[in-house]
């Protein structure tokens, strides 16, 4: 039997998929930072994936009804493309891949399971944006540290009656297929055996509440990020394209720059540094003389930073130094 597993481990989320269902090495294993799958799902362009889903639905329907091999090949190719857009869609690919093999062994093409897959494919274009809206509302009322506070447990209890949300726009929780098993050497964890995309969303949201993990929008990129460290963190560490800085590094530099710009010692040093650097282009000073001066200026600045000399003395030194 095929499976789609998801679990959390030490700041990571792990997905394992297998279309054959052997409990050994999975076909696919992917690791992401904690909550990344849910947050990237929130950023998914549903208008982009809707026509792909509709085409897959048409092809899967033709294959089930007519044993159209070309339709099956087209559906599987597009399912593979969807899986590369977001990890949640890998579940659809693996389930269909399993049925592709199993139906010929069991001679049951058009089974209730095939009809279930078809129903899910048909409903997803409407369900995906609805899930996004419900997750957004859950963030606002339960997890967003800036609007809901630092106690997700209390906010969840406030906004739900048993397992039903008081606000109809909130995500509604249902029983999900959870196991508990070894996931790494010497470590066990709850493991979700997903049967739908909804299961994975459900597991991510309830895990945040159980762990009292809040979310916040990054001050640099504006994306949501989980506050798994300091609750005062304002910049995220979400994945970025190769070669780019993560927002937390950018934020640290911005804070340093702001601090320096407000520092009269640094401002005095920087002003004189830029003035003398311009002398190089004007031919008033050699490179060697400038760098020798800048080395001495840094030493004097450090003295001023440590209150060995006063700001006035440092400014006088800058004015008179050669």
Where are these regions (language model features)?
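Long alpha-helical, hydrophobic tracts
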Residues: 228-232, 283-284
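Extracellular/mature segments of secreted proteins
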Residues: 244-245, 255-257
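Short loop/turn segments at secondary-structure transitions that flank enzyme active sites
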Residues: 224, 242, 253
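C-terminal accessory extensions appended to soluble enzyme cores
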Residues: 308-311
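Cysteine-rich micro-motifs
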Residues: 230-250
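Short helix-coil boundary/hinge micro-motifs
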Residues: 1-226, 256-257, 264-280, 287, ...
């Amino acid at each position: 039997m095929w499976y789609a597993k998801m679990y959390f481990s030490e700041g990571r989320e792990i997905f394992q998929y297998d279309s054959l269902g052997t409990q050994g090495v999975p076909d696919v294993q992917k690791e992401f930072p904690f909550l990344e799958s849910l947050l990237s799902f929130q950023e998914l362009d549903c208008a982009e994936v809707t026509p792909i889903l509709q085409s897959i639905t048409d092809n899967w329907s033709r294959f089930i009804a007519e044993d159209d091999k070309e339709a099956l090949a087209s559906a599987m190719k597009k399912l593979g493309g969807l899986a590369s857009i977001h990890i949640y869609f890998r579940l659809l690919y693996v389930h269909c891949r399993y049925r592709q093999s199993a139906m010929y062994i069991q001679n049951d093409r058009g089974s209730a399971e095939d009809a279930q897959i078809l129903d899910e494919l048909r409903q997803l274009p409407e369900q995906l944006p609805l899930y996004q809206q419900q997750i957004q509302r859950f963030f606002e009322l339960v997890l967003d540290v800036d609007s809901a506070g630092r106690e997700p447990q209390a906010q969840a209890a406030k906004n739900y009656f048993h397992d039903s949300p008081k606000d109809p726009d909130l995500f509604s929780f249902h029983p999900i297929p959870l196991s508990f098993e070894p996931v790494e050497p010497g470590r066990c964890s709850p493991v979700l055996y997903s049967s739908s995309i909804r299961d994975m969303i459900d597991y991510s949201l309830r895990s945040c509440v159980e762990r009292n993990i809040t979310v916040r929008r990054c001050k640099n990129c504006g994306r949501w990020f989980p506050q798994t460290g300091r609750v005062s963190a304002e910049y995220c560490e979400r994945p970025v394209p190769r070669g780019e800085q993560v927002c937390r590094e950018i934020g640290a530099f911005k804070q340093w720059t702001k601090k320096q710009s407000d520092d009269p010692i640094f401002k005095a040093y920087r002003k004189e540094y830029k003035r003398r650097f311009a002398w190089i282009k004007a031919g008033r000073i050699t490179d060697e003389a400038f760098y020798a001066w800048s080395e001495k200026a840094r030493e004097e600045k450090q003295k001023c930073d440590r209150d060995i000399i006063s700001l006035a003395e440092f400014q006088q030194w800058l004015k008179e130094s050669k």
